[in-house]
Amino acid sequence: MEPTAAGNLLEIMDLARTLRQEQLFIQQEQTAFGQLTGALETNAGTITKLAFVCAQQRQILNELLVARNDHDPLLSCRRASAYDSAQFMDAKQVLPYEHALAYEDLFNYLYNTPYLLALSLATADRLSLLSSGQLGQIINTIATGLYGNAINTKDVELLLKLLRELIEIQLLGSEQPRRLLRTNSSSFARLYQRLVESLFSARIFLTAALHAPLMGVLSEHDVWLDLDPHKLMQSFSQKERERRFGQAGEGEHGEEYQRNVARFHAETLGKLHTHAQVFVKSLQQSWALFPSSLRWLLQTLSQQLRQTHRHKEQEIRQLLTDLVFTHFISPAIVSADLVGIIDVNVSERMRHNLNQIVQLLQRLALNDEGSELVQLMELLMVGETGEDVVAILPQQTDFERSQLAINQRELSQFVEFFRLLTSRDEYDVSAEERQRLQRILGRIPKQQQQQQSQSELPDATANSPEKQQNNNNKKNNNRSLMRLGKAKKKLANSMSFSNSNSNSNKNLQPAVEQLPPLANGQANSSNISSASNGDLEQCSSHSGSNTSLSSCGAAPAAPTPAPTAVTNDHQYCARDEPVLMFSIYNASAKSKLKPLTEEEVLKMNCIGQDGSNLLPAVACTTGVVAPSSNNDDVSSLEAMRRPQDDASIGNSDNLEAISEAAHSVASSLDLEEQQERDVHENEDNLSDMVSANVSGRGTPNISGRDTPSSQVTDGDGGGGDMAHHHGHHVRAANPQMQKMLLSKARSDIDDKFCKFELKKFEVDENVSIISDTWSTDVLASDSENTLDATGSERGGDRGDRGDRDRDRNFSTPLIPSAVVLPGDNNFVVEALARAGAGVISGPHMDASDQRSESNWSTDVLASDSEKLAEIDTDDNASITAKSDIGPGSGGGAGVPEAGGGGGVVGDDDDEDEQTPGSSGDGEPDPDPDPDRERLRNGSERSQEDSAFFDAVNSYEDAHHLYHGASSLARSSVRTSYHVMGGESSFQQQYKSSGAEGIGRKTTPLMGTSCMRRQTSAESSISNQSLNLEEPPPPPRALAKHHHHHQHRDRDRDRDRDRDHREHHHKSAALKKKKHQEHKEHQHRDLIDFSDCSEDKDEEEQPPGLVQQLLDMFNQEEQQQQQQQQGCSSQSSVEHRRISMEQRSQCIDGRRNGILAGSMRRHQSLNYENHEIMLNSMLPKTDDDKQELLLCAQTQQQLQLEERAAAAENSCSNRAGAGAGAGARGTSKPPSKATGAIPKSISFDASADKEQQPYRDRERERDRERDRERDRDRERDRDRDRDRDRDREHHSAGIFNKLKQGFFKHRRGGSSSSKNNAIAIAAPSSINPNPSPSSATDPGGRSVSFDPSAGVCVSFGTHYCDSSEDILAKYRRKVSSSSEATNSDSTGNGAGGGAAAAAAAAAAHLHKHVNGGLLPGVAFGSVKQKLRTVLSKTDLHSGDFRQTTPMRPLDATTPLQIYLQIQLAQCISLQRLPQISHVAEALRCLEQLERPQHGQLLVELQHDLQRRQSYLQYLMRHRQQLLLRSEQLEQLEVRLRSEARSCQRCLMQSLVRLYLAWARQQDKLEQFQTEFGQLRASDERVELVEEFVEQLLQQLITSADLLDDWQVDAAREAIERMLLELMYQQVMFPNEDADVSRDTVLSAHIGKLQRFVHPAHPALCIAQEYLGEAPWTFAQQQLCHMAAYKTPREKLQCIINCISSIMSLLRMSCGRVPAADDLLPVLIYVVIMANPPYLLSTVEYISCFLGRKLDGENEFYWTLFGSVVKFIKTMDYLD
């Protein structure tokens, strides 16, 4: 019962407020997404630049300090600062565009081919083509530029693969591989060093393992360590010896001296071993943090060395120890300050001590068999050997690199390096790789050419053949080079590599010129191997221009000799020299940041909750739609570049597989075991029979040709061609069908074969009958499609196989494998899509084709039934279906072939499939599975031909593959193979079903063409497993199909078919078992479809143009046919058109989503295949809308004609049951299979034909009364569905089933399900008058509510209202004219009784559709408009109430009242856009009945609840964006810190070398003399500060320091060097007195440690703070003070100590602690730490910094000083 009017109005106000809140939140979040996404993209580019700068500065530091190549420190600092302020520019803005593309192609090619890079480097090493410095530059370019300094997971992976290839090429072939590991001795050693320097995980491990031991060593400032103490004795000065050991002499003095020396030796060795043990223990504790990438590399090296059997185990162990200790851990210990492990400046004495410790550790690791380090090395070898690189890398998603940075000098060197290699015969690469490299390099100008073009002296090398050749082919390039600026001149003048063999190598040019251009992109498979995410060939998206530009005759010439020398000049990077940014083709970077749309999230939500079975279908659509949208040219480039792609299905072998697949089954199998489910399986079997038999298998076609159009064109043109490039998306959803069909085809094969006498093809009576009867007026040229040509365009070895293809493709050239029937959207979608893709090279199917096809379908007479009784089941499963549903054609047949991740989910029958890494060039496996071969091409067709594919596929796939998992689990797992590569798991879950919208945005036709090419028979066959009500049929039918045809084909391919049969026999039992298991779980899983059907379908629906065009064509056809045919043929035509109309209604109903959840659940299963996927017909672009407008206009004209035809050809009405059967497509299956077609074939049309004119007038007069009657009929029809089905089950023959096969896909409801018996909302809207035609008879196509749903609650969101509105307008005009027009609004052009029945059905539909909407009003559109209005307006006053009206039926509903209030408010506020919106909503509401207003509100509330998942997604997505943004910010901070650390180290080195000059040494000696003469501390401080400033000014002048931070860094470095030099004097000005005082205080504190504890009453630490005791980190900070030498660094340790205590106290109490809280804790920490030289440290800091402190630092320092004073006065006796 409805609530009161006032209550309703309040509810509407509340609903509007809620919708407004939701809308505001969504808008705010989307705005924030845009801002965050932009910031993330900017940060990602910044990180790429920072990584380049860090790497370059690190290299400069290594050259200066580690390599010790006598580099000028001043020049090194200038280079570092130049990189810090470098200008990064897009290479396309600096270089000529074609040159920039060529560079990008080179980088992207090499980026994805580690083997080629490894071979190049190994060749350069072996031939010594380059000097050590030059090769180092090349390695630097690869590590820094190509692999981005290894900060990204993908880059680390590729760098590891490169090292693995170098292991195989360099180390395994060497007799002494250990030598090659020495620094700079091989490319492997260089790259390994760059890897360990760049890996952040390596730095984490080193910091964890080495920081504490290092600080311990550095804290002992007065300690000398050496393995040979005698060397230390010699290094001491005479004064130092006397101080340490006393006077050397005779007697007692001599003995004491010797004792002191011996004690010193023992202490030195003891301390050395103690420190070494500390390092060993720390390594043991941190060994679990050893980087997994390095561990994988070591395991790979160990395994491969052992496999050679040329090296002893000891040698292998030593080599691995060298890699870990000598080249990884030891350099980090010695140069800890340079690596960044510690921030302490390491003096020469400390570095000497660390060197001694490192030598001892290496001895232990190499020579001591029982040492702990040897055990640690053995631990590294434990684990998974042979593991893939990806498995050991962290799967991070925070940073995706899309750019590559390289300066022009390195760019020139890199190109010249490969020019030099490709000109050498010793460069042992394949001809294809060499050819591709030469073509790319040929597009890049040489340095000589650049110099000449820039200097405008083209005649300098006019006689050079290289120059002539490039002048002929690259005139434009040279002209553009003439315009190059200063940057180009630097590039031209930069270093080039010498080539001593260039003259002899010029002979290579003719051979290179004779090489054919890269046919169809013969890219090396390694180029593809690393692009599993589908983005790879975008990695070479310009590679198409490689083939086009470089194959035009611009053959690369051998480089000419040029004098080369690595000088210091080229090392200098000028400040104005830009760093070039090239693109790395990585689309996943952007796809990760793109949020899902509302509809995508809602679809995913449905899948996750109730419709897991739909997920794979959506995932498939994602792959199909997106790639095919705007990749017409890209896909062609990819096709040219992917010769070995396993998705290359356009080759002749695969075409042969299609042909054999379609005809490998005998044509006269009985139908015994299919009768139970032929209601569904034979929905389109007539179309299959037509396509299979019209051309006559084995006989010449009507046109005299055997054309493979129905085999190849449908699947390969639209699906195959796109599957060729995006195969893993296209075929991803096929496994489900494979399993279903395999399971059916495996049983009782021998028994079936024994039933038949195999005959020759030429005498097949079925061929003759059907051909003679149906195809006399058909010419092959009418609709012969050209996938043959398409395949030949793409194929590699197509030539000699074309004849075989034609021999094997026997289907009619007129009919596509999915026969295009009225309302079937398949073929024209396909043709248009492929025409748009540039694939069609033959005529499309036009109206004449469809007219001819209608002739076939209507010319069949009852007398043919006896002969047709033996129609084979291949005819019942169409040709394309045969290729799709072959027993061996499991999910993997369609999926893994595509080259994507989909292949992983193939079923058990997929062992011999091609995997992404295998060759897909058309060479089949030795024993290919025939049905899998069929699927490789047929699967694409099937996906496009029928929407069934997606739903069944999603269910079957998920069910078979993830059988025991939940729906969500299955859907999630399935999704991961179809989402765009590199997405986070979170986004994959949402993106799985929604990503199809990506492609949908760009092309309405191509997207669905790949998806929809599925035959009707396949749809119906698979659909039987979707039928909830029917028992699981025996999985036997397809075995009959395939094997009988295999016998018929035995004359052609006897051996191949025998192999196919053998394969079928092997897997028959397994498939049967799997199918039965699937059936057992069917009821449980299929329920999960419930609420996602209409959401799910939106993308899978083909463009609206196709169906409407077919309607028009078939109206004309059927009018002509029915003038010549009898009533039965008229019924059949009408029947076909009825089901087409029903399908249209379902489309509209699904589009508007007015389906109850429970009904929708059944409908998604039983509305047949098209129904499951229909909503992809939603027009998403303006083109779609224009197409629909055109169709609607044409419809009006056709409807007028149809009315005339209906008046002329009216036939007598049929009985109720027969009418019901005909109206529903006679979907009841016969209970017994006789194998023959009954003489009496029921082509009953819908009932109530005689009442149709009356209903027209009745509806115009009193719409409400008829609507109520229709609702009653609806209810009764739903109750009687099973009974009707059983009756028809016994009365229908094969033609009855064939008739069902034509139409069941095209109507809204399935007769085999009680799906429509349940209505959720407004029971009054259910029709009390049962009419069989009310559910599925043709109604006005203008009505967009599924007829069988009654008044239901929509759980979907609906889109494209504008196109719906346009169609609705035309529909109103049509339906308001007359009943005949109404009946014909869906294209029913049948004459006589057929037209009358269709009109009656239209009348019913118009009355009960949308729960009783007026004709032409789209319920979903009204709801969408109402949502828009309510979410954009808000009441400024709620002071309104409604009184109860006198006449309730005439009253204005609360919804109208609210909108009237809104309209008045908008007029008052002059909000023009809102006025128009509200007025339109009011207009739409006026056309609805009062109960429907309540229904609208109920659905809006349900939609609001459903959209909660979208709001949650928005919050989660924002959280992810925020997290990713923070990660990028932290990465940026880390990189900036690394850059600053490098520059500080450079400045420190510069200052050290600067002070080492002789002139500065004199100044230092003079300063020390003056300092020693002063006694007052103030005077000493002033002298030090003056001297520091003097040195700083000189350094600024000489080193050209401009930046403030450089000046500050230089000042700190000078202070540190100077105070380290005079540390004893400044720290202990009173020498021994200060030392003794510190010793006394240290002993006092040591006694206090014995009894002081945190809870000691003298400390008075609050109880709440005791939980964090003993504050270990704070104690460590105080202990580390001794390692630092400057007062500022020591003060920073104290501040760090106090800050850590404060943070812990704040964490304990939740508030900022007071000084009284801090002081007792600090006392305890100082006592327990007992830092050395405490008093001297306090005096040192106070002397130099006491007056300069302020703020927090001053407070902390004052606090610390008071603590020290308090401790001095503490009495430990208390």
From Swiss-Prot:
<feature type="compositionally biased region" description="Basic residues">
    <location>
        <begin position="1061"/>
        <end position="1076"/>
    </location>
</feature>
<dbReference type="InterPro" id="IPR001936">
    <property type="entry name" value="RasGAP_dom"/>
</dbReference>
<dbReference type="InterPro" id="IPR045046">
    <property type="entry name" value="Vps9-like"/>
</dbReference>
<dbReference type="GO" id="GO:0032794">
    <property type="term" value="F:GTPase activating protein binding"/>
</dbReference>
<dbReference type="GO" id="GO:0005096">
    <property type="term" value="F:GTPase activator activity"/>
</dbReference>
<feature type="region of interest" description="Disordered">
    <location>
        <begin position="983"/>
        <end position="1102"/>
    </location>
</feature>
<feature type="compositionally biased region" description="Basic and acidic residues">
    <location>
        <begin position="1246"/>
        <end position="1291"/>
    </location>
</feature>
<comment type="similarity">
    <text>Belongs to the GAPVD1 family.</text>
</comment>
<feature type="region of interest" description="Disordered">
    <location>
        <begin position="1115"/>
        <end position="1142"/>
    </location>
</feature>
<dbReference type="GO" id="GO:0051223">
    <property type="term" value="P:regulation of protein transport"/>
</dbReference>
<feature type="region of interest" description="Disordered">
    <location>
        <begin position="661"/>
        <end position="727"/>
    </location>
</feature>
<feature type="compositionally biased region" description="Basic and acidic residues">
    <location>
        <begin position="674"/>
        <end position="683"/>
    </location>
</feature>
<dbReference type="Pfam" id="PF00616">
    <property type="entry name" value="RasGAP"/>
</dbReference>
<feature type="compositionally biased region" description="Low complexity">
    <location>
        <begin position="1115"/>
        <end position="1125"/>
    </location>
</feature>
<dbReference type="InterPro" id="IPR003123">
    <property type="entry name" value="VPS9"/>
</dbReference>
<feature type="coiled-coil region">
    <location>
        <begin position="1516"/>
        <end position="1546"/>
    </location>
</feature>
<keyword id="KW-0344">Guanine-nucleotide releasing factor</keyword>
<feature type="compositionally biased region" description="Acidic residues">
    <location>
        <begin position="1091"/>
        <end position="1101"/>
    </location>
</feature>
<comment type="function">
    <text>Acts both as a GTPase-activating protein (GAP) and a guanine nucleotide exchange factor (GEF), and participates in endocytosis.</text>
</comment>
<feature type="compositionally biased region" description="Low complexity">
    <location>
        <begin position="519"/>
        <end position="533"/>
    </location>
</feature>
<feature type="compositionally biased region" description="Basic and acidic residues">
    <location>
        <begin position="1077"/>
        <end position="1087"/>
    </location>
</feature>
<feature type="compositionally biased region" description="Basic and acidic residues">
    <location>
        <begin position="929"/>
        <end position="944"/>
    </location>
</feature>
<feature type="region of interest" description="Disordered">
    <location>
        <begin position="869"/>
        <end position="947"/>
    </location>
</feature>
<feature type="domain" description="Ras-GAP">
    <location>
        <begin position="157"/>
        <end position="396"/>
    </location>
</feature>
<protein>
    <recommendedName>
        <fullName>Receptor-mediated endocytosis protein 6 homolog</fullName>
    </recommendedName>
</protein>
<dbReference type="GO" id="GO:0005829">
    <property type="term" value="C:cytosol"/>
</dbReference>
<feature type="domain" description="VPS9">
    <location>
        <begin position="1635"/>
        <end position="1774"/>
    </location>
</feature>
<dbReference type="GO" id="GO:0016020">
    <property type="term" value="C:membrane"/>
</dbReference>
<feature type="compositionally biased region" description="Basic residues">
    <location>
        <begin position="1038"/>
        <end position="1047"/>
    </location>
</feature>
<feature type="region of interest" description="Disordered">
    <location>
        <begin position="784"/>
        <end position="811"/>
    </location>
</feature>
<feature type="compositionally biased region" description="Basic and acidic residues">
    <location>
        <begin position="794"/>
        <end position="809"/>
    </location>
</feature>
<feature type="site" description="Arginine finger; crucial for GTP hydrolysis by stabilizing the transition state">
    <location>
        <position position="182"/>
    </location>
</feature>
<keyword id="KW-0343">GTPase activation</keyword>
<feature type="region of interest" description="Disordered">
    <location>
        <begin position="1214"/>
        <end position="1342"/>
    </location>
</feature>
<feature type="compositionally biased region" description="Polar residues">
    <location>
        <begin position="688"/>
        <end position="713"/>
    </location>
</feature>
<dbReference type="GO" id="GO:0030139">
    <property type="term" value="C:endocytic vesicle"/>
</dbReference>
<feature type="compositionally biased region" description="Low complexity">
    <location>
        <begin position="1310"/>
        <end position="1335"/>
    </location>
</feature>
<keyword id="KW-0472">Membrane</keyword>
<dbReference type="GO" id="GO:0006897">
    <property type="term" value="P:endocytosis"/>
</dbReference>
<feature type="region of interest" description="Disordered">
    <location>
        <begin position="444"/>
        <end position="480"/>
    </location>
</feature>
<feature type="compositionally biased region" description="Basic and acidic residues">
    <location>
        <begin position="1048"/>
        <end position="1060"/>
    </location>
</feature>
<keyword id="KW-0254">Endocytosis</keyword>
